[in-house]
């Protein structure tokens, strides 16, 4: 199993991440699709090729093709939106009167349950650090009666995946020295 490959690749100083990754992969707070879609989306958001390959290996056995592509789509569209809305927010309203002019059709028609796509978008936004997008996706989820504990679990997952990506990059970099 590829999650096991990731855990084995983590150095001793990342033992907490190894344990956290194991526990989040066995969460009961998220459905299987929510869990694996979030793992794929957040792995893609970290830009760590090794992590994305390993998680995808397992995810392709669990997710439908539509769900797998939607998770990758969440990472891609939020990669654009997080930069745009984070930057726009930092400019103190100077550009609020201008139309974004960005296509975002996948958000309205992701090919999976809207709540799942929103959850993945929230998790990616946590990694990318866009407060505007975090607030917007959290509100959409809460308005859809998604439990706070489910939302919080997606945020926990994003933080774990981000830390694992950092530890793998560090280990790979130091192995090349």
From Swiss-Prot:
Reaction(s) catalysed (UniProt annotation): N(6)-[(R)-dihydrolipoyl]-L-lysyl-[lipoyl-carrier protein] + a hydroperoxide = N(6)-[(R)-lipoyl]-L-lysyl-[lipoyl-carrier protein] + an alcohol + H2O
Offer one example of a GO biological process linked to this entry.
cell redox homeostasis
- What positions constitute the catalytic site? 130 (proton donor), 133 (cysteine sulfenic acid (-soh) intermediate)
A molecular function annotated in GO for this UniProt entry is: hydroperoxide reductase activity
Q: How does it assemble?
A: Homotrimer.
Its keywords, alphabetically, are: Antioxidant, Disulfide bond, Oxidoreductase, Peroxidase, Redox-active center
Q: Which Pfam families match?
A: CMD
Report the function annotation for this chain. Answer: Antioxidant protein with alkyl hydroperoxidase activity. Required for the reduction of the AhpC active site cysteine residues and for the regeneration of the AhpC enzyme activity.
Checking NCBIfam families in the record gives: ahpD, ahpD_dom
Q: Which organism is it from?
A: Mycolicibacterium smegmatis (strain ATCC 700084 / mc(2)155) (Mycobacterium smegmatis)
The record's disulfide annotation reads 130-133
Entry EC no(s)? 1.11.1.28
Write down what this protein is called: Alkyl hydroperoxide reductase AhpD
Q: Does the keyword Ligase apply?
A: no
Q: Which InterPro entries match?
A: AhpD, AhpD-like, AhpD_core, CMD-like
Protein family: Belongs to the AhpD family.
